[in-house]
Amino acid sequence: MAKNSMVERDRKRRKLAQKYSAKRERLKAIIESPESSVEERFEAQLKLQQIPRNASPVRQRNRCAKSGRPRGYYRKFGLARNELRRAAMNGEIPGLTLSSW
């Protein structure tokens, strides 16, 4: 089980990223646009720097929905490997069968 503080920190980052996503995309479009002037780009860069650092989607970490474990995460299921195995053994994931050969 992951520390609750780490799970909450990641939840806060996701919330901030969602809040500032539209503004961030607008500013990045101005910066990357070849039609915008140098002054516009500079102003957009300054405004982008004013956005909180934790609002960047890169700072988010994929975590297991049940345990909060950051490693061994399967995107398709949203679970860590050990929770995925436990759920598969209990038959909680439809269509998932363990292979044996």
UniProtKB/Swiss-Prot annotation:
This protein's name: Small ribosomal subunit protein uS14
Annotated stretches, region: Disordered: 1-20
Family affiliation: Belongs to the universal ribosomal protein uS14 family.
GO cellular component, one term: small ribosomal subunit
Claim: Cell inner membrane is one of the keywords in the record: no
Function text: Binds 16S rRNA, required for the assembly of 30S particles and may also be responsible for determining the conformation of the 16S rRNA at the A site.
Transmembrane domains' residue ranges: none
Lineage, opening ranks: Bacteria, Pseudomonadati, Pseudomonadota, Gammaproteobacteria, Chromatiales
Compositionally skewed regions (Basic and acidic residues) per UniProt: 1-10
Gene: rpsN
InterPro entries (UniProt xref): Ribosomal_uS14, Ribosomal_uS14_bac/plastid
UniProt-listed NCBIfam families: PRK08881.1
Assembly: Part of the 30S ribosomal subunit. Contacts proteins S3 and S10.
Keyword terms: Ribonucleoprotein, Ribosomal protein, RNA-binding, rRNA-binding
Gene Ontology terms: biological process: translation
MF terms (GO), sorted A to Z: rRNA binding; structural constituent of ribosome
